[in-house]
């Protein structure tokens, strides 16, 4: 319904990741990700959903499915320019950020005109360190 932004609103999202084997953990207890399976989660104001140790070139789709009456949703993938959309898609990279930032905006009547209320959310994909092993070669003196 109407009214001002509520920082306790739970907004519902779904994430699907492909190009992965096995099960991947998240920062939510009991919530795991498997290849091609849609996983639902909720976020409140300022919260972040994290998927851990994803391999390079895994593909993801994130969709906000319940906006709680907010009129506008913007999404930014890897800190690039905002797009007005409920859906974000991308590929895991080793050489940079793997983030999806959502911003929901609600226009509320105000005695002084129009007030915009904005709630930010983030989805963070943590790439696995390539191979997870670093080799150091000792120079022979």
What are these regions (language model features)?
Residues 1-141:
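Solvent-exposed loop/turn and edge beta-strand elements of beta-rich ligand-binding domains
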């Amino acid at each position: 319904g109407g009214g001002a932004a509520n920082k306790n609103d739970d907004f519902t999202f779904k994430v699907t990741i492909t190009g992965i084997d096995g099960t991947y953990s998240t920062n939510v207890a009991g919530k795991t990700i498997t290849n091609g399976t849609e996983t639902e989660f909720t976020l409140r104001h300022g919260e972040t959903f994290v998927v851990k140790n994803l391999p390079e070139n895994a593909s993801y789709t994130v969709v906000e499915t319940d906006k709680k009456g907010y009129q506008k949703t913007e999404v930014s993938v890897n800190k690039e320019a905002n797009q007005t959309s409920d859906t974000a898609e991308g590929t895991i990279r080793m050489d940079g950020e793997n983030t999806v930032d959502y911003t929901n905006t609600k226009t509320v009547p105000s005695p002084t005109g129009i007030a915009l209320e904005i709630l930010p959310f983030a989805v963070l994909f943590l790439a696995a360190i390539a191979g997870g092993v670093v080799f150091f070669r000792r120079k022979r003196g």
